[in-house]
Amino acid sequence: MFHVSFRYIFGIPPLILVLLPVASSDCDISGKDGGAYQNVLMVNIDDLDNMINFDSNCLNNEPNFFKKHSCDDNKEASFLNRASRKLRQFLKMNISDDFKLHLSTVSQGTLTLLNCTSKGKGRKPPSLSEAQPTKNLEENKSSKEQKKQNDLCFLKILLQKIKTCWNKILRGIKEH
């Protein structure tokens, strides 16, 4: 009862819930000369970019992930950490082994270069999208195609943002 009255008296959730982050990370970016990025990650990101074939109209849709997580100043490592973990979810999709290899290399390579130590409870990663109830086989097939197209759009945007964020980090290091 005290908890309920506290929330209603002050009109806000308990302050402790607002101030505590879900998970924070300390990252120490290794390979600051850019060699590992240029020779391994960049090559694999470009290969993945070329493997994803779709119209550019999906680039106008900005998924919520990018509204919540961005490569702002002093948040680059945190963004890359989250983005790499998001890439791991795509490994569960029905994709070619070559595609999985490149995706795994980018995800694992980024996490290795970031060298992050997580301070927080591990959370189960959310699924790529929620399951939709099926009405008939034809609608189900088209919705699966649409879901796959949306996932590939998201992946394409995510790869571009990862590349941009790495370039931002390397430019900042070279300027200092």
Curated annotation (Swiss-Prot):
Which intervals of the chain are annotated as region Disordered?
118-143
GO MF, one annotated term: interleukin-7 receptor binding
* Keywords for the protein's UniProt record, in alphabetical order: Cytokine, Disulfide bond, Glycoprotein, Growth factor, Secreted, Signal
Q: Name one GO cellular component term.
A: extracellular space
For the keyword Signal, the answer is yes
* Source domain of life: Eukaryota
Q: List glycan-bearing residues.
A: N94, N115, N140
Compartment(s): Secreted
Q: Which GO terms describe its biological process?
A: bone resorption; immune response; interleukin-7-mediated signaling pathway; negative regulation of apoptotic process; positive regulation of B cell proliferation; positive regulation of T cell differentiation
Q: List the disulfide bonds.
A: C27-C165, C58-C153, C71-C116
Magnesium as a keyword of this entry, yes or no, is no
Any one Pfam family here would be IL7
Which positions carry the signal peptide feature in this UniProt record? 1-25
- Family per similarity comment: Belongs to the IL-7/IL-9 family.
Give the matching PANTHER family: INTERLEUKIN-7
What interactions and quaternary structure are annotated? Answer: Interacts with IL7R and CSF2RG.
What does this chain do? Hematopoietic cytokine that plays an essential role in the development, expansion, and survival of naive and memory T-cells and B-cells thereby regulating the number of mature lymphocytes and maintaining lymphoid homeostasis. Mechanistically, exerts its biological effects through a receptor composed of IL7RA subunit and the cytokine receptor common subunit gamma/CSF2RG.
Q: Which named protein is this? A: Interleukin-7
Its lineage reads: Eukaryota, Metazoa, Chordata, Craniata, Vertebrata
